[in-house]
Amino acid sequence: MSKRDYYEVLGVAKNASDEEIKKAYRKLAMKHHPDRNPGDHAAEDKFKEAKQAYEILSDSDKRAAYDQFGHAGVDPQSGMGGGGFGGGGFSDAFSDIFGDIFGGGGGNRRDRVYRGADLRYNLEIGLEEAARGTETKIRIPTLEECGTCHGSGAKPGTQPTTCSACGGHGQVRVQQGFFSVQQTCPRCGGTGKMVSDPCPSCHGEGRVKKHKTLSVKIPAGVDSGDRIRLAGEGEAGVNGGPSGDLYVVIHLKDHPVFKRDGDDLHCEMPISFATAALGGEVEIPTLDGHAKIKIPAETQSGKVFRLRGKGIKGVRSHAPGDLLCHMLVETPVNLSERQRELLREFEALSPGRNNNPRAQSFMDKVKSFFGT
């Protein structure tokens, strides 16, 4: 089967400019691309035909051979020196076309820049620091731009060279069936540059390992898991790319008195059994000092007293939480003989379980369970 004239395939005149040829090919490629015409074999054939025509007409040497000898001039089997289909013309157009369609566009030759990696630092602080806010200094390991080569990776007085494998694109095309796929260049690692004479300070990396000290402001009300972002304090970028960010993650230390629950605080308050039975006034700790609360008579262990506004005002809260005090009635120890005697007397004056409502309730449940 004879091949159609390549100018006819693209719908351009024989004296068409390179831009006209490229424009015509872009239009046909987008119209007949197999991804846009799944299962349409006719469209696939037209796509291949347009691709072949552009491969020849976009290359000045191949176009000249085609204009002089026709298809025989570019057929590798004819022996007339056309060179076959290896060139970069199609690759560039393919990249431009599908960069337009899918938002990519890897056809330029700008040095590839990469943003530096983000860093994480776990910071332990006390409950009081979290409640009131504080400022502290941290020391972190990171990668900074090399001061000797200023990030180029090349020895001073020399310059990186363009990677010959990818032509400075940082990516290469690998043919897979009828399609070509872009991949990171294995030779330059995607930078598009090669360093033949590396910098002695960074050994060609363009970045060096260092420790730096930063001051971090901790806002009042932070809690475990909260993150503080320090923009641009992460690792340095590559080829002049922007630095990453540093995320300081807050972790609260255990407190000897309080436990935090959101904006509320909890604490246990031991009281004597005499105070629990007769009532009284006790002094309890808060983050702002001490406060006094009245304990009513017959207070049971586990009773909770709420002090409103004595908790923590969270970062995103409009008002502070509460302090919840859990009463813990203590059993006396190290009793003297006189104290033991008085307790025995008290027990003797307590007929049945009337003075112990919980015990009475428990015994009633036991009797009900056994049916007695």
UniProtKB/Swiss-Prot annotation:
Coarse class of the protein's main subcellular location: cytoplasm
CDD domains: DnaJ, DnaJ_C, DnaJ_zf
Compartment list: Cytoplasm
Gene3D superfamilies, sorted: DnaJ domain, Heat shock protein DnaJ, cysteine-rich domain, Urease metallochaperone UreE, N-terminal domain
GO BP field: chaperone cofactor-dependent protein refolding; DNA replication; protein refolding; response to heat
Pfam families membership: DnaJ (PF00226), DnaJ_C (PF01556), DnaJ_CXXCXGXG (PF00684)
Positions bound to Zn(2+) 2: C163, C166, C185, C188
Zn finger limits (CR-type): 133-211
SMART domains, sorted: DnaJ (SM00271)
GO cellular component: cytoplasm
Cofactor note: Binds 2 Zn(2+) ions per monomer.
InterPro entries to which the protein is assigned, alphabetical: DnaJ (IPR012724), DnaJ_C (IPR002939), DnaJ_domain (IPR001623), DnaJ_domain_CS (IPR018253), HSP40/DnaJ_pept-bd (IPR008971), HSP_DnaJ_Cys-rich_dom (IPR001305), HSP_DnaJ_Cys-rich_dom_sf (IPR036410), J_dom_sf (IPR036869)
Domain remark in the UniProt entry: The J domain is necessary and sufficient to stimulate DnaK ATPase activity. Zinc center 1 plays an important role in the autonomous, DnaK-independent chaperone activity of DnaJ. Zinc center 2 is essential for interaction with DnaK and for DnaJ activity.
Subunit-level organization: Homodimer.
Protein's name according to its UniProt entry: Chaperone protein DnaJ
Gene that this polypeptide is encoded by: dnaJ
